[in-house]
Amino acid sequence: MAVKKLADLLKEGVEGRHVLVRADLNVPLKDKVITDPGRIDASLPTIKALTEAGARVIVAAHLGRPKSPQDTQFSLAPVAEALSQRLDQYVALASDVSGEDAHERANGLNDGDVLLLENVRFDPREKSKNDAEREELASELAALTGDNGAFVSDGFGVVHRKQASVYDVAKKLPAYVGYLVEKELEQLSKCTDDPQHPYAVCLGGSKVSDKLGVIKALAPKVDTLIIGGGMCYTFLKAKGYGVGDSLLEESMIDECKNLLSEYSDKIVLPSDIVVGKEFDANTEHKTVSADGIEDGWMGLDTGAESIKTFGERLNGAKTIFWNGPVGVFEFEAFANGTKGLAEAIAEATKNGAFSVIGGGDSASAVRNLGFADEAFSHISTGGGASLELIEGKTLPGVAVLDR
């Protein structure tokens, strides 16, 4: 793939030029306070390289899923503040995405300045299914950069989206990949292009339907496929076990039966489950055998015996990819499974495995549970994007840069 890189743009020279950077700054907030700044930190190397080279940087990003511009809880104001602190310079926030204020502020930028546009998803054209509407917003964003602008794609968490600020704008300006996207593609390729064996994949999360494509794509290629989290109950049901009130996708039972029959030597399911009476942090709970979940109880975490088995299967692996927690880690009583799996992967990494934490909830989980990023080979910033790449899908936001 012939994609131009940020290093190429810096070589061409950016002093005095407006550069639009699409970053992924979609950080978790609680009462307008950022609880995990990981994605902001991951975007800094690209922004800093541009400001230090004298570019006038305009950052486009989204936060959450706002219904309208009046949805002020999704304003990027806390992100502008966090960027200002981390860059040690004032980062202005435009009050709109591509309107009058954005233009005025973009025109007023000096070399090395940074402007953050308001949440691009405040503009319904960003995610429009109508190509012409997206193109229109993309043209307005490109216009912010004037006559000699450039576009840098550095939001790995959104490159699987065909959206105006990710895909369409890349066709309007000279386009480059930023340091983060370059690093993500390089690291994830170690799981897709001839990975070292034994290769183990751990999949958690709630729905089989969300991960079915990945499971089908990976099962023939991997040596071990560990399945936990909410989606394991549909697999347990497919084995003929009762699952009580646990999360269950009836429509996926036959798919799970087929997978279990074809890959019985590779698929590893929990042997014990921590069950609770209700989906609540303080609910009554106990550990039961995977085939012993009674009515009135729901599976909320992976049991200690299962985690021990998972660890044994991961021991000696050369490549490990993990996406999705294996329990309700947000509740302390049900975080042990996810923590235990993270410990097993960290241990395997210490012993020479190349490990990737595939973004999204898994990345938040390992950080919230106190693991240093260095405990793993790579923590991806993109949940959906990393899964689609692992599955072998084309990422529109990357493919569009290949010119």
Curated annotation (Swiss-Prot):
Pathway: Carbohydrate degradation; glycolysis; pyruvate from D-glyceraldehyde 3-phosphate: step 2/5. GO terms for biological process: gluconeogenesis; glycolytic process. Keywords: ATP-binding, Cytoplasm, Glycolysis, Kinase, Nucleotide-binding, Transferase. It comes from the Bacteria. Substrate binds at D24, L25, N26, R39, H62, L63, G64, R65, R121, R161. Its EC number is 2.7.2.3. Its main location: cytoplasm. It catalyses: (2R)-3-phosphoglycerate + ATP = (2R)-3-phospho-glyceroyl phosphate + ADP. ATP binds at K211, G299, E330, G359, G360, D361, S362. GO terms for molecular function: ADP binding; ATP binding; phosphoglycerate kinase activity. PROSITE patterns: PGLYCERATE_KINASE. It is an enzyme of class 2 (transferase). GO terms for cellular component: cytosol. It is found in: Cytoplasm. Pfam families: PGK. SUPFAM superfamilies: Phosphoglycerate kinase. Belongs to the phosphoglycerate kinase family. Monomer. PANTHER family: PHOSPHOGLYCERATE KINASE (PTHR11406), PHOSPHOGLYCERATE KINASE 1, CHLOROPLASTIC-RELATED (PTHR11406:SF23). This is Phosphoglycerate kinase. It comes from Corynebacterium kroppenstedtii (strain DSM 44385 / JCM 11950 / CIP 105744 / CCUG 35717). The gene is pgk.
